[in-house]
């Protein structure tokens, strides 16, 4: 049996990068249902088809129910549709919500003084208001099952880097909102945690830091362990915590390097 056997999971931003890597890992861990959400239907449907080909960890397990929903998480109407379609697919049962969808805004990112207001609002709507509305809409179903909410944050939401504009501000807000949700939901059995995945070799990170060498960054698949932990019953007593996904990856990389050096 996989670590996520019986779990129904909704993931936003699932058509590429970290979201796609999480969806694949969750399927391999035996999730009962996966609702994958992203803006572009063509990319999303390719991921859905990939997931359907993944062998389950044991007979009778695996992602038996997969739904792909093209939607914009900056739209309140789209969010209502996403949650309604997900609950319809899973017969009202939702165990895990992963708020992963994100945008960095204009590239290169302008300084705050020069930031267009409409672009600023779009980033906040996607990175902060969207997760708030997803939690708000999904929460009644999750309270019934003592679910897990995982918000994907950033180091830019923990340290005020110059030049990161609306993105950093939105991630600061997401960390604060995560702490508040965790406190307010503590008595309900729903846990809320947030994860800083670090720099990864994804399209978004390459656009954000074009001067850096992306081959030195982690691949998204390498940092999924913490998400499996938080989605599983292993974390049933963990809430209100911030995790850094790459700590595990870096320690594994160090051990691999040490082994090679001794040969």
Residue ranges and their predicted role:
Residues 187, 194-198, 202, 210-253, ...:
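C-terminal helical subdomain
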Residues 15-16:
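Conserved glycine-rich cofactor-binding loop
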Residues 108-112, 116-121:
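Substrate-binding pocket helix/loop in short-chain dehydrogenase/reductase
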Residues 135, 170:
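Active-site helix of classical SDR
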Residues 140, 182-184:
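Alpha-helical segment proximal to the catalytic Tyr-Lys
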Residues 154:
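Residue(s) in the substrate-gating loop at a strand-loop-helix junction
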Residues 31-47:
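Conserved glycine-rich Rossmann-like NAD(P)H-binding loop of the short-chain dehydrogenase/reductase
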């Amino acid at each position: 049996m996989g670590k996520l056997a019986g779990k129904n999971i909704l993931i936003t931003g699932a058509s590429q990068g970290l979201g796609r890597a999480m969806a694949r890992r969750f399927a391999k861990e035996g999730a009962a249902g996966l609702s994958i959400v992203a803006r572009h239907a063509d990319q999303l449907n390719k991921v859905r088809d990939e997931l359907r080909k993944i062998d389950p960890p044991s007979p009778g397990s695996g992602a038996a129910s997969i739904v792909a929903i093209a939607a914009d998480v900056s739209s309140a109407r789209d969010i209502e549709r996403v949650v309604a379609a997900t609950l319809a697919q899973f017969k009202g049962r939702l165990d895990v919500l992963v708020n992963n969808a994100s945008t960095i805004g204009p590239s290169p990112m302008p300084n705050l003084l020069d930031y267009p207001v409409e672009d600023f609002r779009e980033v906040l709507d996607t990175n902060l208001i969207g997760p708030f509305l997803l939690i708000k809409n999904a929460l009644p179903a999750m309270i019934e099952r003592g679910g897990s909410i995982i918000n994907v944050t950033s180091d830019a939401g923990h340290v005020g880097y110059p030049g990161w504009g609306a993105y950093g501000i939105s991630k600061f807000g997401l960390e604060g909102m995560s702490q508040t949700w965790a406190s307010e939901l503590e008595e309900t059995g729903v846990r809320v945690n947030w994860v800083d995945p670090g720099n990864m070799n994804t399209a978004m990170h390459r656009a954000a830091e074009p001067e850096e060498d992306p081959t030195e960054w982690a691949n998204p698949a390498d940092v999924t362990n913490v998400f499996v932990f938080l989605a599983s019953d292993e974390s049933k007593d963990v809430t209100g915590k911030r995790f850094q996904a790459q700590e595990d990856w870096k320690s594994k990389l160090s051990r691999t390097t040490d082994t090679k050096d001794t040969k």
